A protein has these predicted regions:
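Dual-mode signal for accessory low-complexity, basic/Gly-rich regions
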Residues: 98, 256-427
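Active-site bordering "gate/hinge" segments
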Residues: 1-281, 285, 297-300, 325, ...
Length: 427
């Protein structure tokens, strides 16, 4: 605190401090292949000097190192162009204390025990089917994290979190052709991870299901995006309503505020303080309190996602979105337990390649792997296909959300069924 009191009173300062310690164990063919321990600390110093901004960072939190980092940030600020929208957030929107968020579950874990769990995970995959012929191993990881923020407008906050995960990657072979897939579980609470057996078997099932993939002809048809792929679509939507995309006029959703983007049964909410949420945070990177909000209500876009800078640039209220926290899809219609059974003919997409979402135009084109659906059942896997459409059209054509919600990531959604998408095939 002595360093803080010795700062230049003509400037504003912000300090973001993060610490993380934990380990990762990879096991392959019943042997420990790699163990990594980490104990990381970092500080980012931001200086605002007459609307000029300077940033510097350090991994050394000694007094001497912090003083040097502050001086470096000050020097950088002197050589940047002034920007009237730069500066700390107003003091009335920043936090003074942090709440218990339900994301910190420390546990004393022994590396030998975790190695045994990883070995079991891989072994279950091999035992599931003789066509599982190889593996990239199973990996267990754990981390304890802490974040603190303070600035010279007397804002202060901190929170702790834990992260645990277990994953397995397998390879299957049939008729001299090989396929690769995986499964993983992640949680804030170790006790909420899927079991090693569940993860190993799911990895094996997913890999086996890819064998015998065929090419198909080009067509337009209904498409189901698996929860993992559906979250990617919603991620593109979030990018398009971010402050930078809006003030740079580089979004296909520019001037779409208060207009219907999705069908009326779609609601999308941000829940920053969700217990066990992978994106849970009490404040954003500027120190602004995060708040629950209805981003999409009855299909209508209610708000952009603005940090301090973009809100000033757009002359709009800051929404505390210097970070995206937990996003949840909450449809008003019942969620089918199995969207596949609702389709006479269509495609299930489980993997996409490349970054083919153009946020400026909304044009969407990505390579994909999936499964052909006939009469409510999967007929066979399909490969060498391309998903081509426009994001705005895709959002408008959402027909249903499945109840298979993926709770592992910060974007929580089930499978999404979208009508009339062009699938590019080989003929």
């Amino acid at each position: 605190m002595k360093i803080i009191t010795n700062l230049n009173k003509k400037h504003d300062y912000q300090f973001n401090v993060t610490t993380s310690n934990g380990f990762s164990i990879n096991c392959r063919f019943k042997e420990v292949e790699n163990i990594e321990y980490h104990n990381d600390t970092g500080m980012v110093v931001t200086v605002f000097n007459d609307y000029k901004k300077g940033i510097a960072s350090t991994n050394d939190l000694s007094s001497a190192s912090i003083e040097k980092t502050i001086a470096k940030a000050e020097n950088i600020s002197k050589n940047t162009q002034p920007d009237e929208y730069q500066g700390l957030p107003e003091s009335n929107v920043t936090l003074s204390m942090s709440k218990n968020l339900g994301i910190f579950y420390p546990k004393d874990l022994k590396t030998d025990d975790m190695a045994s769990i990883a070995k079991t995970c891989e072994e279950e995959a091999f035992n599931f089917d003789k066509r599982i012929v190889n593996s990239e191993g199973a990996t267990f990881s754990a981390a304890n994290n802490e974040h603190m923020i303070l600035n010279t407008k007397e804002a202060f906050g901190s929170f702790k979190s834990t992260d645990y995960s277990l994953s397995c990657i397998t390879l299957a072979e049939e008729n001299k052709l090989m396929e690769r897939d995986y499964w993983y579980s992640s949680a804030r609470d170790y006790n909420k991870l899927e079991t090693a057996k569940q993860i190993g078997i799911k990895a094996a099932k997913r890999t086996i299901s890819r064998l015998g993939a065929k090419t198909i002809s080009t067509r337009s048809c209904p498409v189901i995006f698996s929860p993992e792929m559906a979250s990617s679509l919603i991620g593109s939507f979030l990018s398009a309503i971010s402050g930078p995309a809006i003030y740079k006029k580089s979004s296909f959703l520019l001037e779409k505020l208060n207009q219907r983007i999705f069908p009326e049964f779609i609601n999308i909410k941000e829940k920053p303080h969700l217990a066990d949420g992978s994106g849970t945070k009490p404040y954003d990177c500027d120190g602004v309190l995060t708040i629950e909000k209805d981003i999409i209500q009855n299909g209508t876009l209610n708000t952009y996602l603005l940090d301090t800078y973009s809100s000033r640039k757009l002359n709009m209220k800051c929404t505390g979105n210097g970070v995206i926290t937990n996003i949840t899809m909450e449809p008003d219609l019942p969620c089918p337990s199995n969207l596949i059974e609702t389709l006479e003919d269509g495609i299930l997409i489980t993997e996409m390649m490349g970054s083919g979402a153009n946020i400026l135009t909304g044009d969407y084109s990505r390579g994909a792997f999936g499964y052909l659906i006939k009469n409510g059942k999967i007929e066979h896997p399909v490969t060498e296909i391309t998903v081509a459409s426009n994001l705005l059209k895709m959002f408008e054509n959402i027909k249903s959300i499945g109840n298979d919600f993926d709770l592992r990531n910060n974007i929580r959604t089930g499978s999404i069924l979208i009508d009339n998408i062009t699938i590019g095939g080989t003929t």
